[in-house]
Amino acid sequence: MGRTLESKQQIVGELKELLAESELALVLDYKGLSIKEMSDLRDRLRAGNAVCKVTKNTLMRRAIDGDSAWSNLDSLLTGTNAFVLIKGDVGAGVKAVQAFQKETKKSETKGGLFEGKLLSQDEIKAIADLPSKEQLMAQIAGAINAVATKVAVGINEVPSGLARALKQHAEGGDS
């Protein structure tokens, strides 16, 4: 028995809400994945503030219809698709998908969409290679701390050098 019109409209509404909250969408070919493996993927994504939805391409097409930010996703809507919708830390979500794919060797990323632009496989891998927000903040804090330390050492060195010169002069060595 197929879904009722109300059920389909509800799914399209949920997809529209998820898309409105998402920054990045990945389209995966999930053919061959077991229910256990899909549950594993969903658990991994949940930790990275992402969600994996399996829905008919026609329902996703209806959800993106008229939305210029997501309209380019239409070209990826063929075959059996799972949609990974990532909000927040996109790098963590992409890393979770890639780690899952590396372990299972069953699913394949067809492509993605970020800020209205279709992403190739290489661009998706580049996003995964980016450091997380926390790592960037730590690097910046380390750089700022290093500069402050160098300034403090430099300021401290001036009186120390002067004191050594005065001591040497007082001991009678004019070199």
Curated annotation (Swiss-Prot):
The molecule here is called Large ribosomal subunit protein uL10
- An annotated GO cellular component: ribosome
- Keywords assigned by UniProt, alphabetized: Ribonucleoprotein, Ribosomal protein, RNA-binding, rRNA-binding
Q: Name one GO molecular function term.
A: large ribosomal subunit rRNA binding
Q: Which domain of life is it from?
A: Bacteria
* Annotated function: Forms part of the ribosomal stalk, playing a central role in the interaction of the ribosome with GTP-bound translation factors.
Question: What are the TM regions of this chain, as residue ranges?
Answer: none
Q: Which GO terms describe its biological process?
A: translation
What organism is the protein native to?
Answer: Parasynechococcus marenigrum (strain WH8102)
Q: Does the keyword Ribosomal protein apply?
A: yes
Q: Could you give the subunit structure recorded for this chain?
A: Part of the ribosomal stalk of the 50S ribosomal subunit. The N-terminus interacts with L11 and the large rRNA to form the base of the stalk. The C-terminus forms an elongated spine to which L12 dimers bind in a sequential fashion forming a multimeric L10(L12)X complex.
Q: Does the keyword ATP-binding apply?
A: no
Family note: Belongs to the universal ribosomal protein uL10 family.
Sorted alphabetically, which InterPro entries does this protein's record hold?
A: Ribosomal_uL10 (IPR001790), Ribosomal_uL10-like_sf (IPR043141), Ribosomal_uL10_bac (IPR022973), Ribosomal_uL10_bac_type (IPR047865)
